[in-house]
Amino acid sequence: MGSNSGQAGRHIYKSLADDGPFDSVEPPKRPTSRLIMHSMAMFGREFCYAVEAAYVTPVLLSVGLPSSLYSIVWFLSPILGFLLQPVVGSASDHCRSRWGRRRPYILTLGVMMLVGMALYLNGATVVAALIANPRRKLVWAISVTMIGVVLFDFAADFIDGPIKAYLFDVCSHQDKEKGLHYHALFTGFGGALGYLLGAIDWAHLELGRLLGTEFQVMFFFSALVLTLCFTVHLCSISEAPLTEVAKGIPPQQTPQDPPLSSDGMYEYGSIEKVKNGYVNPELAMQGAKNKNHAEQTRRAMTLKSLLRALVNMPPHYRYLCISHLIGWTAFLSNMLFFTDFMGQIVYRGDPYSAHNSTEFLIYERGVEVGCWGLCINSVFSSLYSYFQKVLVSYIGLKGLYFTGYLLFGLGTGFIGLFPNVYSTLVLCSLFGVMSSTLYTVPFNLITEYHREEEKERQQAPGGDPDNSVRGKGMDCATLTCMVQLAQILVGGGLGFLVNTAGTVVVVVITASAVALIGCCFVALFVRYVD
């Protein structure tokens, strides 16, 4: 056993706790270059998000989508994501692919993003070339475009959970924190580049004339960036399949051994058990002791048991999910209506006037400036994610979490009360603070919770382990699906508020109020590990 564990390229990483079957294992320190490569997925994802934000409304309008169907487009994707995120997250915890647990899901969702972009940016052009009947052409163009938007949104929202779980699987605790900061950094860079390319008038450039329309130009760039970024990401750090843990290790029955999860690990809080093939031999021996029992456990994991695990999650996980929901509700309330706010309130344009009127042209100018504001948000998100590494040593995760919500709440409040072009653009930098906070701090807290639970198991080896089917994939997915729930709340509630108040100012004020409520929640209810 000892000689096998000492083979080249395979080292044992033990905790400082007492030796025993509950020893944690720590993957090696990852080079910064590998963490940057891992973060390229966030760059590609956010680039494509920015392209969608800039072009999806013009695309939907150009194909003739009735306004009555808008709600279906924006509701279907988050509803599907909210229902399926924990299911797929748990399935990835138990995936036995030879390529690892997370990468097969990331690759599949990346392909779905690419197909979705191809459908909503090129679908109408392809349909026009294939169908001559005007009525059938309209129906098919709308259908293909809607399917593309829903497919892209679903995959892009979904993929964040597996990417985070992949990072947690293969990195040490310190590298997880560094990796999350790099994720936020490249998220901002990707969004900024996407908004900048979307602001270029491609119709008057050679590339635009060569490819046909600006929609095809943006698909070319999106497909290129997404393919390159995800290829680099998937090759960044290797994953060991779960079956490799038990390879070449004889089974050893122990009557008092606690039940194992389907992947041969003590499931709840399993973030530090076996990662990237670096195996504690005593732990691996227990993990391999009864393969048939593990397979039966995996097959017994039903949707009912999964929902039970979600309902019975520990209170500190539940509070973290609620705080994440509050934060994303505030953030999306502002971001989804920000360009319209700039056009109508700051520039005092009218989107409902004739398209050749002065009021409509002023509104369009406001929308363009609003896009530059979103670009400022992305740039400052990247900058703040870099400074987070310095700030966390002074104010901790609680200070970072509270500060992000507070600055966003105050900034959006000032924008709503005093709408001015220059002050609004300056305050857009605070949107970036909130964005970086939402992408890093909650997931840092997840790693802290898992690390704390691992230490508790080491200190009490005779205690009963948690028998739930929870794992880090499910925890990341549950946290991520709060984004979909926030989209559902925003899509269903803000339209009613705007119609009732008669102005989009209510959107910005609502975002400010929700963020300030979130300040109180993260300070009073979210638990922080010392």
Swiss-Prot record:
The keyword Glycoprotein applies. The chain crosses the membrane at residues 47-67, 69-89, 111-131, 139-159, 185-205, 217-237, 319-339, 367-387, 399-419, 426-446, 478-498, 505-525. Its main location: membrane. Glycans are attached at N356. It is a multi-pass membrane protein. One of its GO terms (molecular function) is sucrose:proton symporter activity. It comes from the Eukaryota. Pfam families: MFS_1. Expressed in mature melanocytes. Residues 1-46, 90-110, 160-184, 238-318, 388-398, 447-477, 526-530 are cytoplasmic. One of its GO terms (biological process) is lysosomal lumen pH elevation. It is found in: Melanosome membrane. Changing S435Y: In OCA4; uncertain significance. The keyword DNA-binding does not apply. It catalyses: sucrose(out) + H(+)(out) = sucrose(in) + H(+)(in); D-glucose(out) + H(+)(out) = D-glucose(in) + H(+)(in). Residues 68, 132-138, 206-216, 340-366, 420-425, 499-504 are extracellular. Disulfide bonds: none annotated. Keywords: Albinism, Disease variant, Glycoprotein, Melanin biosynthesis, Membrane, Sensory transduction, Symport, Transmembrane, Transmembrane helix, Transport, Vision. GO terms for cellular component: melanosome membrane; membrane. Interacts with TYRP1. Belongs to the glycoside-pentoside-hexuronide (GPH) cation symporter transporter (TC 2.A.2) family. It is linked to Albinism, oculocutaneous, 4: A disorder of pigmentation characterized by reduced biosynthesis of melanin in the skin, hair and eyes. Patients show reduced or lacking pigmentation associated with classic albinism ocular abnormalities, including decreased visual acuity, macular hypoplasia, optic dysplasia, atypical choroidal vessels, and nystagmus. This is Membrane-associated transporter protein. It comes from Homo sapiens (Human).
